[in-house]
Amino acid sequence: MTTELAMLATMLAVVVLSSFAASLIPGRPIPEVVFFVAAGATLGPHCLGVIHASQGLALMSRLGMGILFLIAGYDLDLRELAGRAGRHGAVCWAICMALAAAATALLDLGLSMAGSAAFAIALTTTAYGTLVPIMRDRELGGTAVGGVIESYGAMGELLPVVAMSIMLSPTRSMAANIAVLVGFVVVCVMVARGGERARNLGGRLVRFLSDNAETSSQALLRATLLLLVALLALAAALDLDAVLAAFAAGFILRRVLPPEQGKGLLAKVEAVGNGLFIPVFFVYSAMDIDVAAVGANPALLATFVALLLLVRALPVGLCLRAFPETRDMPAGEKVSAALYCTMALPLIVALTEAAVGAGAMPSAMASVLVCAGALSVLVIPVLTNISRVAISTSPVEAAQRIAASPETARQIVHEHHERLREAERAFHAERAELRREGVRLSAADYLARAEELRERHARELRRIHEQNKHEIDELRESRRK
């Protein structure tokens, strides 16, 4: 017990320091989960050996994973996913999956069929549950980029989890996995409908949960954790992926609870999860990363990073350009949305942990894949800056003009260089103005919210102009009197 408490204290210390380190980077472009994973790998048995596996920490880690994906499941709106944007998000994920399967076959990684499937699925994921609070913090809700993340990102989390549940049970055939999965879904639907009926009937238990939701007993929060733990236990008994059980708990809560009550409850669940269990999940899961194995094969690591970007970001960007509801989005918003949908580190951690546990993937390869996920998150800010510069200079237009009139190539290059300098001056001026207003944005956030921020700035200038005009009119009127 003393050893476990000491390890937990160490983990929480690095969690606090990781959050502080993430806050020091202007615009906070790197999520703190990257720092959690780095801390776990550093403290684990393959590096410093400060923390090691234990039953108590393993249980806390499993609860953290459950709370993380319960929140993600609650944030998914099935009615929106059934709409046009959701269907297009599903089509995009299917394209990503086909590309990932082809890339996995070409790489010839020496994995079993289940291992190859797990690897391919990991390349197609989006950590939607992690992006939701990031969207909230960066005020992306209601923007075009936020809408894309809600459809494409949600499908990029839901469909990989379902695929993993079907393909990753070492003890059953795929047909048996599908049958068990259908049975599990039926049980969850029955629980949700039973909860709805109980809420509508308003029995004594329902009244107790509602009346004591804000008291010291926190009855509704306790009932929520009961639902989560019960579904995790059921999934373990049925040999299903625990991520699926956590998703199901979120779906049930969204269906049973009224919206206002659900938001209040979710805030408490997030406080419990983000305060303790979710960071422990990331640090503890990253503990098994074999740093030596990652360093021994840098070419494979670079290949995995490139695949994560090409297999997910590129198809999302092309689909946004192809489908009618997103075709007219500015290029910067498409780039930002595609790169946000590529952020998959938390789900990669969960999926590789499940794959290693099922014996479908060696721990060394899982280590490389998790590190690739972390590096892809680090690369995204660089790519957004490159994209912002490319959008400002219009290189395609410049190439077309040079091809049509080669003798004026120097003049064309000079014109586009001046355009870039002007765009850079405007970009830094706008960011400086936003910083004075207390808003700090990364390049990805700037691309996502550029139009909205310009409109807001223009409205503020108009307001100031009208206010000054009104004050001048009042001053003139007072002088006349």
Can you annotate each of these PLM segments?
Residues M1-A6, P45-G56, A102-S116, M164-A179, ...:
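Helix-coil boundary and interhelical linker segments in multi-pass alpha-helical membrane proteins
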Residues A192-E214, I252-A271, L309, A313-M343, ...:
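Membrane-interfacial segments at transmembrane helix termini in multi-pass membrane proteins
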Residues M1-A13, E32, A53-L70, S112-Y128, ...:
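Structural signature of hydrophobic alpha-helical transmembrane segments
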Residues V34-H46, A90-T104, E150-S165, L209-A230, ...:
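Small-residue-rich segments of transmembrane alpha-helices in multi-pass membrane proteins
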Residues L24, A82-G141, V283-D288, A296-I391:
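Transmembrane alpha-helices that form the ion-translocation and gating core
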Residues L24-R28, T42-H88, R204-F304:
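Membrane-interface junctions of multi-pass transporters
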Residues M11-S19, S23, V37-A41, P45, ...:
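Transmembrane alpha-helical segments of multi-pass membrane transport proteins and ion-pumping complexes
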Residues L107-I121, T130-I178:
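Membrane-interface helix-loop-helix junctions at boundaries between adjacent transmembrane segments
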